[in-house]
């Protein structure tokens, strides 16, 4: 089983993934991505879905028009783990392909 990050480890990791923040009241991290339109937002979600499925680690997310809101936590570990940080970094890289920093 993957280990939950300590508060210090989580803070250090968050510094390496732009735009992500801790979720108040939960051991989770979150970010909103805003794209040009729905097609880009859906394209982003499709690409992330392939990465998430391969990693067997799936986001909590929702999409409204051009905005995708994401929450990451590792339910089995009861909080944020390296798997969440890695998926967040992958999401940032995919968003970058659409010009979203």
UniProtKB/Swiss-Prot annotation:
The keyword Transport is assigned to this record: no
Cross-referenced Pfam families: Pterin_4a
InterPro entries registered for this protein in UniProt: PCD_sf, Pterin_deHydtase
CDD domains the record matches: PCD_DCoH_subfamily_b
One annotated GO molecular function: 4-alpha-hydroxytetrahydrobiopterin dehydratase activity
UniProt keywords, alphabetically: Lyase
UniProt name for this protein: Putative pterin-4-alpha-carbinolamine dehydratase
Catalytic activity from the UniProt record: (4aS,6R)-4a-hydroxy-L-erythro-5,6,7,8-tetrahydrobiopterin = (6R)-L-erythro-6,7-dihydrobiopterin + H2O
Superkingdom, natural source: Bacteria
Similarity remark: Belongs to the pterin-4-alpha-carbinolamine dehydratase family.
Taxonomic placement: Bacteria, Pseudomonadati, Pseudomonadota, Alphaproteobacteria, Hyphomicrobiales
Keyword Lyase on entry: yes
EC code: 4.2.1.96
EC category: lyase
UniProt-listed GO biological process terms: tetrahydrobiopterin biosynthetic process
Coiled coil (UniProt feature): none
């Amino acid at each position: 089983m993957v280990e939950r990050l300590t508060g210090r480890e989580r803070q250090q990791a968050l510094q390496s993934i732009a735009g992500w923040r801790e979720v108040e009241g939960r051991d989770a991290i979150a970010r909103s991505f805003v794209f040009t339109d729905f097609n880009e937002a859906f394209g982003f979600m499709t690409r992330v879905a392939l990465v998430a499925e391969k990693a067997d680690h799936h986001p909590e997310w929702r999409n409204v028009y051009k905005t995708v809101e994401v929450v990451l936590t590792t339910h089995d570990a009861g909080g944020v783990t390296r798997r969440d940080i890695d998926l967040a970094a992958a999401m940032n890289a995919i968003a970058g392909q659409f010009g979203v920093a």
